Amino acid sequence: MKTPETLAFECETGNYHTFCPISCVAWLYQKIEDSFFLVVGTKTCGYFLQNALGVMIFAEPRYAMAELEEGDISAQLNDQKELEKICLQIRDDRNPSVIIWIGTCTTEIIKMDLEGIAPKLEKQIGIPIIVARANGLDYAFTQGEDTVLAAMAHRCPEYKHCTTNLKNRTDEMARIDNHTTNKSPFEASKLTRFNLVLFGSLSSSIASQLNLELKRQSISVSGWLPSQKYEELPGLGEGIYVCGVNPFLSRTATTLMRRRKCKLVGAPFPIGPDGTRAWIEKICSVFDIKSYGLENRESEIWENVKDYIQVINGKSVFFMGDNLLEISLARFLIRCGMIVYEVGIPYMDRRYQAAELLFLQHTCRKMKTPLPRIVEKPDNYGQIQRMHELKPHLAITGMAHANPLEARNIDTKWSVEFTFAQIHGFSSVRDILELVTRPLRRRGVITPGFRSLSKQTTGD
């Protein structure tokens, strides 16, 4: 098989494996600390959440299942009354600041009017209700977060209200009876002339590090979507610049631009030292600020991880496609000296990822490496045949194919691990390389000197 010399896109419209997007509850309920997620679905959805999240219901996590029964599907029960009972119980037991309903495949099939029921119920219970249809009709499981953030963007306060009256909350909160707050989501001291809002769910430590990196360039971040507290959602509107940190948030980006009239900063994503530097430089250029110190910072980090890079330099990797992080990870691994044969990706918004695709081409030219083949909606059967021919050193794949590929003597890494690991910013580079090199270390395909430096040498 010939490796293409130019950026080639293909769409196989085949069968591929990924998780259900309702899995976004796993990380979003921890990020939004005063929220409660209610998944409206069947027993299958409940079994998936129970197994995927690994939290026993006795631990009383801030999410729950509203299990559909035969009476719901046959329209013998009143959907509004049934959901009202559950939401009242949630209010009395947990008293969250917001309840987020997650629609599923079944609610789509039976045409359950969640958007029509939510406004009526939130007036009754005095708590805002956000409806997000994060169902299995999406292309990849990470798009669940995209759906939730796009729905949450509509509830962010209007930017002009934040500047004129700091005591006003969001418009939707004003419509809810008997539900007030003493804290403004947007304080005057936090407003800057740049008005930059970042969107994407990251751990608090990584978000703080990205804030600090921008602060070093004299740029203060106005807020994050999502915020840790629902009442702290950033103000949106004309004059606000928004920038994403994850490549699977195209729906949120579209909502912010078209519905909230924000200006999108099209930048590569801050994954790897090269991506983080390019991300910061792009934001600086939008605000006419000359960045400084980034080149030296990036060089120092590459020097600090050269032991890891020696392990994967010259090795080949094949992305089967699972979580929409594939383009950014491929670009980073090419910069580390790896050869990427193919990048399978369930779905790609070429407009939202335009800067990342250009950066991928730039990286390939810099490393004098042929551009990888990009396959949307890949056919897993065809990919396995191509891997049999190419014999890559490593396959980054979904869990469904890991063991079969290992049996074919191909080292694998679960792509879902990159979703939950800290991979953003300058400080997370070692964590990414730790994940990538672990399968090679497990087989002993490393030098003895490196083994003593690694944090983990056996098992996944």
Swiss-Prot record:
Binding-site residues, [4Fe-4S] cluster: 20, 45, 105
EC number from the UniProt entry: 1.3.7.7
Pathway info: Porphyrin-containing compound metabolism; chlorophyll biosynthesis (light-independent)
Major place of residence: plastid
Alphabetic keyword roster: 4Fe-4S, ATP-binding, Chlorophyll biosynthesis, Chloroplast, Iron, Iron-sulfur, Metal-binding, Nucleotide-binding, Oxidoreductase, Photosynthesis, Plastid
The organism's place on the tree of life at top rank: Eukaryota
Annotated catalysed reactions: chlorophyllide a + oxidized 2[4Fe-4S]-[ferredoxin] + 2 ADP + 2 phosphate = protochlorophyllide a + reduced 2[4Fe-4S]-[ferredoxin] + 2 ATP + 2 H2O
Required cofactor(s): [4Fe-4S] cluster
Top enzyme category: oxidoreductase
Keyword Cytoplasm: no
GO CC annotations on file: chloroplast
Subcellular location: Plastid, Chloroplast
Entry GO MF terms: 4 iron, 4 sulfur cluster binding; ATP binding; metal ion binding; oxidoreductase activity, acting on iron-sulfur proteins as donors; oxidoreductase activity, acting on the CH-CH group of donors, iron-sulfur protein as acceptor
Alphabetized Pfam families for the sequence: Oxidored_nitro
InterPro entries documented for this protein: LIPOR_BchN/ChlN (IPR050293), Nase/OxRdtase_comp1 (IPR000510), Protochl_reductN (IPR005970)
Cofactor note: Binds 1 [4Fe-4S] cluster per heterodimer. The cluster is bound at the heterodimer interface by residues from both subunits.
CDD domains on file: Pchlide_reductase_N (cd01979)
GO biological process terms on file: light-independent chlorophyll biosynthetic process; photosynthesis, dark reaction
Quaternary structure annotation from Swiss-Prot or TrEMBL: Protochlorophyllide reductase is composed of three subunits; ChlL, ChlN and ChlB. Forms a heterotetramer of two ChlB and two ChlN subunits.
Record's function text: Component of the dark-operative protochlorophyllide reductase (DPOR) that uses Mg-ATP and reduced ferredoxin to reduce ring D of protochlorophyllide (Pchlide) to form chlorophyllide a (Chlide). This reaction is light-independent. The NB-protein (ChlN-ChlB) is the catalytic component of the complex.
HAMAP family: ChlN_BchN (MF_00352)
Record family assignment: Belongs to the BchN/ChlN family.
Protein name: Light-independent protochlorophyllide reductase subunit N
Organism: Adiantum capillus-veneris
Gene encoding the protein: chlN
